[in-house]
Amino acid sequence: MNRCLLLNLSHRSGEDSFPALCISALHTCRCYTHLGASQDSRAGYSY
């Protein structure tokens, strides 16, 4: 996960690195949300 962020930041520069970071963070949040929902059926998160 962190490796992907570092690769995105290293290959991009300036303002282009910010959207890449946001996109990576969004995918990470979705991944954790999915894992959390699968582990705990009471979570009920839906994005």
Swiss-Prot record:
<protein>
    <recommendedName>
        <fullName>Protein YqgG</fullName>
    </recommendedName>
</protein>
<dbReference type="Pfam" id="PF23505">
    <property type="entry name" value="YqgG"/>
</dbReference>
